[in-house]
UniProtKB/Swiss-Prot annotation:
Protein name, per record: Putative membrane protein insertion efficiency factor
Record-stated family: Belongs to the UPF0161 family.
Upper lineage: Bacteria, Pseudomonadati, Pseudomonadota, Alphaproteobacteria, Caulobacterales
Main location per the UniProt record: membrane
Subcellular location per the Swiss-Prot or TrEMBL entry: Cell inner membrane
GO CC, one annotated term: plasma membrane
Listed HAMAP family: UPF0161_YidD (MF_00386)
UniProt membrane topology term: Peripheral membrane protein
Record-linked InterPro entries: Membr_insert_effic_factor_YidD
Keywords: Cell inner membrane, Cell membrane, Membrane
Amino acid sequence: MNLYESCVRGALRAYKLTLSPLIGRQCRFFPTCSEYAAEALIGHGPVRGSWLTVRRLCRCHPWGPSGWDPPPPPRRKGAKWTCET
């Protein structure tokens, strides 16, 4: 585990121990928003992972969708975008 991954996991653990009990378990999705954030930040890095996390948090509200919503799989390094018709 590298330093970045340790920091992400530590920050999410601190959230789960301090703020999460006050807010309650109200996430409409699985994995929960904090688990999604960990997977997105570690799998995609700080920039894209943060963007994916913000998008997910914007979808997590009482009138939004619910259910299974995992982060997209990480892009392979060196992979090129292609468009098949």
